[in-house]
Amino acid sequence: GDVYKRQSDERLKLKQRIVHDVLEKYKNIPKDDAIGILSSVGGFEFTCIVGVILGAAANNALVIIDGFNTSACALVAKTLVPQAMDYVMASHLSAEKAAKSSLENLGLEAYVDLGLCLGEASGGSIQMGMLDLAVHMYLAVTGGKA
């Protein structure tokens, strides 16, 4: 119990120190310099997700973001191409502290709040099931006519 708590506290302090150091190092990057922010602190995975969002929007395809990390990517995409948000949907309201404000900044609303914070796209999986059901019901009611 005590050993685990001490290790958890130490890991949290290390993470906080790393975040502080990164913010200090890159404090001069303007907030609207999406490429500068992404290239400094985003990493390969975040860059790929931003590309998926922009590519989907360019092809009139929907992207479901799932959790805070993908919300951060969507914020970068929005800075680059604000119209891309017309093709982004939030799967759920993550339990992470900044989730609500990030969705508000994106102009998105979460359809469900399940307290998820798993990092396994579980919210997106639930949202896909809900969308599939909604389309199925719509087609049943309209006789298959769009």
Segments predicted by a language model, with ranges:
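Flexible, glycine/charged-enriched surface loops at secondary-structure junctions
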Residues: Y26-I37, N60-G67, G115, A140-A146
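Conserved active-site and cofactor/substrate-binding residues in soluble primary-metabolism enzymes
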Residues: E10-I18, F44-G51, F68-A72, L93-K97, ...
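Active-site-proximal loop->helix
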Residues: L12-R17, V76-V81, A99-L106
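Internal helix-turn-beta structural module
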Residues: E96-G143
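Terminal helix/beta-alpha structural elements that buttress the NAD(P)+-binding lobe
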Residues: Q7
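Active-site rim loops that border cofactor/substrate pockets in soluble metabolic enzymes
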Residues: K15-G55
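Hydrophobic alpha-helical bundle architecture
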Residues: G51-S71, L75-A90, A110-L116
